[in-house]
């Protein structure tokens, strides 16, 4: 008789323990119920990027002196700088500058170490294409400034910082 009683007590304790675990899980679920949704409707709503966001690189052809510092500091030797030496003025003349964003890791070293500040990071992050060769940008494509997310009237911008209610 006692083994049956101890099994019944163990069964009761296990039932109470299981109910407690289910209750704890339910309380965690309820604590998340009052939060705002994190997902956004992407093509119609976009997050405003942070101030120091590292997006597509912008290049100013007139400022570049073809020193190739950007190539030396890049961990994957990505920027392609073509230049020729002008013997009469003893300076390099930049012919072509290109970056393949299919390979770029957006580390920002090229922007940080550029002595003439001809490179800068933009807030553009939509670089998807159907052909990877379209991600190879030359100096003309790199010189294009993107449309700011805030200035685009066709979409609703959402700040990624939490909303603080006054009052």
Swiss-Prot record:
Cofactor: binding comment: Binds 2 [4Fe-4S] clusters per subunit.
KW Signal (keyword) present: no
GO biological process, one term: photosynthesis, light reaction
Disulfide bonds: none
Chain residues that bind [4Fe-4S] cluster 2: 74, 104, 107, 110
Broad class of where this protein is predominantly found: plastid
Location in the cell: Plastid, Chloroplast thylakoid membrane
Membrane topology note: Peripheral membrane protein
EC nos: 7.1.1.-
UniProt superkingdom: Eukaryota
Enzyme class: translocase
Cofactor(s) in the UniProt record: [4Fe-4S] cluster
HAMAP family listed in its UniProt record: NDH1_NuoI
Family, per entry: Belongs to the complex I 23 kDa subunit family.
Quaternary context: NDH is composed of at least 16 different subunits, 5 of which are encoded in the nucleus.
Protein name in UniProt: NAD(P)H-quinone oxidoreductase subunit I, chloroplastic
């Amino acid at each position: 008789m006692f083994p049956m009683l101890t099994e019944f007590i163990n069964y009761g304790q296990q039932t109470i323990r299981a109910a407690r675990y289910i209750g704890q899980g339910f309380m965690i679920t309820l604590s998340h119920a009052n939060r705002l949704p994190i997902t956004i409707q992407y093509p119609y709503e976009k997050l405003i990027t942070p101030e120091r966001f590292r997006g597509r690189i912008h290049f100013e052809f007139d400022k570049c002196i073809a020193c190739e510092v950007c190539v030396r500091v890049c961990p994957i030797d990505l920027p392609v700088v073509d230049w020729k030496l002008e013997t009469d003025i003893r300076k390099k003349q930049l012919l072509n500058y290109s970056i393949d964003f299919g390979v770029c890791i957006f580390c920002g070293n090229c922007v940080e170490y550029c002595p003439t500040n001809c490179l800068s990071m933009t807030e553009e992050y939509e670089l998807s294409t159907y052909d990877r060769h379209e991600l190879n940008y030359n100096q003309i494509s790199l010189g294009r400034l993107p449309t700011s997310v805030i200035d685009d009237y066709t979409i609703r911008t959402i700040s990624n910082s939490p909303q603080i209610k006054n009052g």
